[in-house]
Amino acid sequence: MVASRRAAMAGATRTPDGRTRAPAYVAGVKAALAVLSVALGATLGALTAGSVLMARRVVTPRRREPDTRILALDTAAQTITLSRTPDTVLPGRYGLFTKGTSDYIKLGSVLSQDATSVKRKLLTHIGADAQLEPEAGFSGWYYDRPEQLHLPYTPELIGSTVGPCPAWLFPARDAETWVIQVHGRGTTRAECLRAVPVFHALGITALVVSYRNDGEAPRSRTGTYTLGSTEWRDVDAAVGFARRRGARRIVVMGWSMGGAIALQLSLNSAHRDAIAGLILESPVVDWNLVVKYQARGQHVPDAVTGLAMEALRTEWAAPLTRTGAAIRLDQLDVLSRAGELRHPILILHSDDDGYVPSDASHDLVVARPDLVQMQVFEVARHTKLWNYDQERWSDSIRTWLEGQGLLPT
């Protein structure tokens, strides 16, 4: 019996206090540790994979995705009923990307609404035989082609390091004062068309530009955005183009990510002396804030978001994120570089933006009250301030230009 007990205890271990642990117990602990190790590895792997996917999503140009549904189309009354979203209930004039007999239609005021739907007036005539698919995309563009403005314009090509970038030039009576319009992430030049009549009425020539990887300008080697850290060079080429055409005072207006691009241009351009000021509509001032805000809205864990931002800013992760090189997010944080700003800035931003929070815009005003003025909107959503209150939006720009001495005489 003693022999059998000794055999059973063979391979047993002793604890620090002298007690003996049986082999079965030790084996169980080892198995548990092995399972824990595998689980931990799987968790870390999932976090890493999730962060890489998120980082790619931040920098990869995407096609417009449907965000509402067409529930009914009344061609006799020229009305359309859409599923209710925070955007489709907004007062004002908007656009709708569609599929079928029309690819884009203009929308007027809200006629009625309930808990699930919104009926709006059609401002684009839709024939009785029209067929539209249910999936649609609500837009603040309103105008989607330059000829809809009924203003003289010419198509131009602006030479940049990535190749010729298409632009629209709307000449006005003053050939020396120009505004260069820079669209945002995931959109094209048409986003800026709303602003052209405002400047044209003031006699200011407007140049509406494209930049690398936006679907109109040439593709870079990686085909990804760099959130303003390289795109500003294409806009800098546009500034050079304007100067060669006689521009002496240039206002740069950026929408959303176009605002981030305009700020980088202001900080880095060799043409800084010709830039008279910036107008920023719903701008990205700090990418860290924007990415975190959007990630939380999509219920992405903070750990994944943090790793994604770290992946974007580190050289070793560039092959995984497909950026080609690290993105200097610290250089894109204009709040931390506010002391370097030299140009007067007008910010138009809504506290109900819903996509790019206005916090950083408010903070920039506090950091540089000598240079930065801000018109704060409410209710209006991201880059839809013109649509919501065209009169106030236009007056804000006109008043600021006058205050800066930039109105043509």
Language-model-derived ranges and their functions:
Residues 224-245, 251:
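Alpha/beta-hydrolase active-site loop
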Residues 351-356, 383:
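Acidic catalytic loop of the alpha/beta-hydrolase fold
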